[in-house]
Amino acid sequence: EMSASLVGSEMCIRDSIDHYTYLNDHSDLDIMVYNNPNVTSGITRETMKELYKLPHVKIVKDASMVIDVMTDYIFEAEQAEEDKAVLCGCDYLLYSAYATGAIGWISMTANILPKLSADFHKAMIVDKDYQKGLEIYKQLYPVVNMTERFPKPTQAVKYILQEVYGFEEGICRRPRRGISDEEKKLVLEWSEIERLSKTNKN
């Protein structure tokens, strides 16, 4: 599977479509479109509607952190002639995204609480038990809040995996740097991970 995103805030819709059309026509790989407007050019609903017409475009990961953008993608996917799907790329919107029709999510939270994350996915996708899913999401929320709120989420996740779970995580690739002792305290406090890690066991 190929993931492709576009850099440049001035990229026009036609350029976006041409870019993905080129990838579609020159590769047999399935394509995941990545919408991350904080660091790349945002993809409009109209653009996504056109991209869904490309046979190798199968899925879009939306990290816009805007629920109406993700909802637009989901509804356009449902109307597409071929099977298309949406992945949630923002943990804050996790419950809303699943309830609207997202089929999964790409998550920092799942690295820290994999069992609870899997339980949430099962409740929402397999069992269609949205009340149970909501209760699980409430349990996940302190970690969700930390990963979205803390300014160095990658370092925070690595610290938790090493400090709480005992994994040998090593150091982050530059230019990311480690976190201070004060930041480590904030990570543990905000995530409530020392309590929640006990729920991560079978």
Where are these regions (language model features)?
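Single conserved hydrophobic/aromatic residue that forms the stacking wall/gate
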Residues: 1-8, 12-13
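Conserved sugar-transfer catalytic core signal across GT-A, GT-B, and GT-C glycosyltransferases
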Residues: 7, 19, 93
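Active-site mouth loops of central-metabolism enzymes
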Residues: 10, 34-42
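Alpha-helix N-cap and loop-to-helix initiation/capping positions
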Residues: 14-19, 43
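Alpha-helix-loop-beta-strand connector modules within alpha/beta enzyme cores
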Residues: 18-32
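Catalytic alpha/beta core domains of metabolic enzymes, predominantly
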Residues: 22-25, 39-141, 147-149
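Glycine-rich phosphate-binding "P-loop"
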Residues: 33-35, 56, 173
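C-terminal alpha-helical cap/extension of soluble enzyme domains
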Residues: 101-102, 109, 113-202
